[in-house]
Amino acid sequence: MRLEQPRNSLKRSTLDLIERVNRDEYPSLPQDSKCKDALVSAFRKTANFKKYNRPDVNSREQLISPSLTEEDLLGRIRQRYKEKIFAGGQEKFADQSFIAEQIASTYEDFKDNPTLPAYCGEMTYLLYYHLREEGIKPENMLVVGFSANAEDHVLLMYSSDEGFLEQIKNDYFEQEEEGEEAESYKNFIELCARRDKNQTLLLLDPWSQDNKILDLNQLDRDESTNEVIEDYFKNKREALEEGFQPHAIIDGVLEESRVSKATGSVINMETLSFQVDAFKPEELMEIDEENTSDSSEEGTSKNRFRDTLFSNVPDSSSDSENEQEREKKELAGKTPSFRLC
């Protein structure tokens, strides 16, 4: 059985985006021609990926058109992805460039398949990878995650000012160190509002059908940055409730009290960074095909870390009381949180 072709709407939305970029509808891009050309090329390369939710999310598409072929392919990609990530666990924190390269390499292994299922996190890192190939420096990009109750979403920030993204990371983690709670979109919006109006600042969302690029310099003078961004994400959440509920593959890493209880809902990372304080590098390097399979012996730190990274099921060693309290807060409508991924 052949995989079904990508959604025409996804391809069409990408082509529409490229046309808008070429028509200079995004005011920042004409003055940043390198970024403009890189975006056109990178988005074109993501057009053939098939939007897909994690297996534990009962999306509308999965309920209507299940495909064992797709599930099998997805499982193979997950396995290869896990092997590559663990094989590189030599540093305390994995940086965004490394993660992007591993994901791109995994998908290259399956390039003969016309459509590959991809989560929003994968699509974002693939876009990051292709932008790097086009000459955009890692210092100009930052992958961030948003969480609305149990729903996570990942997108990419681009700034022509390297210091601005560094400031976002430093300011946000400084807030965490002072014991303040990570604030929904509020913290993110306030940080974006501080920007130098002469810089190019874009939110890039390859998963989105209608809002793949949000140019913050596109705002009218009588509109505040806060209002526009709040409206953007508000509309996005409403749309997700009617259709997809995208989750990043890195959801497990970002969930508070699963890998790092010290930093709340934020784990210090260059983008996808996961803390491995409790896991020795040599242990990570020992993970092979046998002990990363579903039949692996449970209860080891390696398996717990693996399950944390790739499963939405809480780790059995986690503090169940804290986990229940966290879930109650989320279900009660806790304001979505912004996190550096």
From Swiss-Prot:
This is Protein CbhE. Residues 287-341 are annotated as: Disordered. Keywords: Cytoplasm, Plasmid. It comes from the Bacteria. The gene is cbhE. Disulfide bonds: none annotated. It is found in: Cytoplasm. May be involved in the pathogenesis of acute Q fever. Residues 323-332 have a biased composition (Basic and acidic residues). GO terms for cellular component: cytoplasm. It comes from Coxiella burnetii (strain RSA 493 / Nine Mile phase I). Transmembrane segments: none annotated. Residues 287-297 have a biased composition (Acidic residues).
